[in-house]
Structures are given as C-alpha cells and as structure tokens.
Regions:
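Generic hydrophobic, helix-prone segments enriched in Leu/Val/Ile
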Residues: 50, 255-258
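RNA/tRNA-interacting regions in translation and RNA-turnover enzymes
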Residues: 1-242, 272-326
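Intrinsic, low-complexity polybasic segments
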Residues: 238-245, 249-251, 256, 263, ...
Length: 327
C-alpha cells in the first residue's frame, strides 16, 4: 500500500480474505439492524461493512480481489480522469478528489464510493477489505460536486477517529469469517505518522469555569466528570497569568478599540496572580472538544443544567462625561 496524498490520507489498512462464500445470506439480526437504521441490506460483504460503520463509526469498503491488479495506492485524482461508480454513473473528476488505485487505474473514490468494476458480487471468492483515515478537508464538498450523498462521506467530512481503522478491520473480519468462512491474511497498514491528527492539550481555568456556570464545581467533581468522558486530566497548581489569557486579547476588535477586548477578559483572568486549573487532553475520537468552552459545556452537561442557578446578568454602568462639543 502506498500513500501519495500527504495529510489528506495519512492511514490505510487493507486485508485479503480468501475462500469466502459471498452468496451466504446476511444474518437476520444484522439485516434487521441495518433496516432499522435506514440502510437497505444488499449482500453479506457489503452489509458487514455497513454494519461496522454504524457500530464503530468507521467507513469501510470491500473490493473483489480478482478484479484488482498489483498494489494499492491512494493519490490525488487527475484532471479529466473518469471513474465508473458503484451506482453505475460515470464520474468526471478534477484534481481535487482522492482516489484509491491499483497498478492500472482508479478503483474507488476515497471516502465516498467504490468503483463499479471492482465491486463484490455473489461470485466473489476473495475479498480485499479497506479501512482508512481520510482528512475532513480532503472529503468535504467533493461528494456535492458529483451529487453524491453517502454515509461514508458524511462521516469523513465530520471527522473519524484515526485510531479506528485497525479496530474496524478486525471486527469486520470476524463477522465475515463467522458467516461466510474464509482465511484472512495479515493486515497491511500504511501510516504517515507526521500527518495524523494529534489532540492538543487545553487549559481549563477554575475561575473561568465558575464564571461561566455561575456556581462552584468541586475539583474532585470536575476531574471525575472529565475522566469519565475519557479525557486525560492533569491538575495545575498554578498558571502564569499571562499564559492564561487567550491569544487575540489586546488586538483591535470591530469597533477599532484595542483595549476593549482586553478589558472584557478582566473578569476571566487575573494577570497579577496565579490562575488554578487543569490541563486536559481529549481522546482522538472527540473532534468536538477543541477549546476551553467545550470542556465547560461537557462539565455543565454531566453536572446537570438544572443545578445551574438562574440569575440576571450583572453589568457595570459606565458614565461618560459630556465633552464641550456635545454641550
């Protein structure tokens, strides 16, 4: 497997399963769960990839191994390149798409839909399973260019845990072998570690938490909630006050008042005293946690919105002395 798209496709897992009975019926329990999720059962191999996507959130694809030539690669499409998709339409591509290729041609539109010529059928006896991580920016808007709206595309646009591909591969393999038999080969994985998304630590200030929620949540409760959500929490006895002020403070705002932004932060941080708080790191699956306010929202949600007191916002009145011109 070769990755030639940089940060757009930093991880790809593949596995060959030979000797499968692709005509085996999808188990009733799986077909019923797919139907209840709004997905029409098609065939065992396709249904397994769809089911794993629903359970784990990792889109997958199955290729008929007999239709592939040579090694697999992921690259940017070329302007004027065409690909016949699973739904039978011919997609005319520009250079903004990601494609999965074999030695001869594009065989799939990465993160969106597989190719028609390499699809699995009831006659398939060997399958190549794909589970990959594609960056949201590389998939976003590409489906709409072609009028495609797929479950895989919607998930990749919003972000998928980069640690999921191998987990999903093992789960899908187990389900296929249990029902259709076959001999799975080793997982072939290609990774560009420098391009994988890495969660950044977020500083949560105790003073900011109390100010936003309007109540004091104990240190033990804050740490219990965050750890229960799978976050890594490190207690900070003190923070440098300057480091506690978010970037952007003191720059000109819409009114052209450079001091206004800094003054609005006065209630959130004290530049003369240490600010206590926590350094929190979210797991790779939590794309929705990126800033301090996201952490505060999680604490409020678990602690209980009903426990937040109802109070009117307090504002400080400021009297402006009339100038001589206005008089």
């Amino acid at each position: 497997v070769e990755l030639n798209a940089g940060a757009a496709a930093p991880r790809y897992c593949g596995r060959v399963i030979e000797g499968v009975d692709a005509a085996a019926p999808t188990p009733l329990w799986m077909a019923e769960r797919l139907r209840r999720s709004g997905i029409r059962p098609i065939s065992l191999l396709v249904d397994v990839t769809q089911y794993v996507m629903l359970e784990l959130g990792q889109p997958m694809h199955a290729y008929d191994l007999g239709t592939l030539q040579g090694s697999i690669a992921v690259r940017r499409s070329r302007a004027g390149e065409t690909l016949k998709l699973l739904d039978g339409r011919d997609a005319a591509l520009d250079d903004s798409f990601l494609v999965v290729t074999d030695a001869d041609r594009a065989v799939g539109l990465a993160g969106l839909m597989g190719g028609f010529d390499t699809r699995v059928t009831d006659a398939t006896t060997a399958v190549f399973l794909e589970a990959a991580h594609f960056a949201p920016a590389a998939i976003m808007g590409r489906g709409r260019k072609l009028g495609l709206h797929t479950d895989a595309g919607h998930r990749f646009e919003r972000g998928v845990d980069p640690e999921l591909p191998r987990i999903a591969m093992e789960y899908a393999t187990r389900l296929i072998v249990e029902v259709a038999g076959g001999a799975p080969g080793p997982v072939v994985e290609a990774t560009l570690a420098q391009h994988l998304p890495r969660p950044q630590p977020i500083v949560l200030r105790r003073a900011r938490l109390a100010r936003v929620l309007g109540l004091q949540v104990s240190d033990a409760e804050v740490e219990r909630i965050l750890r229960a959500l799978g976050l890594t929490v490190e207690r900070l006895a003190a923070l440098d006050g300057a480091a506690a002020i978010p970037s952007g403070v003191g720059v000109a705002d819409g009114a052209g008042d450079a001091d206004a932004t800094a003054s609005r932060m006065a209630g959130d941080t004290d530049t003369t005293q240490a600010v206590q708080g926590w350094r929190v790191t979210a797991p790779t699956r939590r794309f929705d946690i990126a800033i301090e306010e996201d952490l505060i929202e999680e604490i409020a949600r678990i602690h209980g919105y009903d426990r937040i007191p109802t109070t009117l916002p307090a504002g400080a009145a400021r009297l402006v002395a009339p100038t001589e011109t206005r008089v």
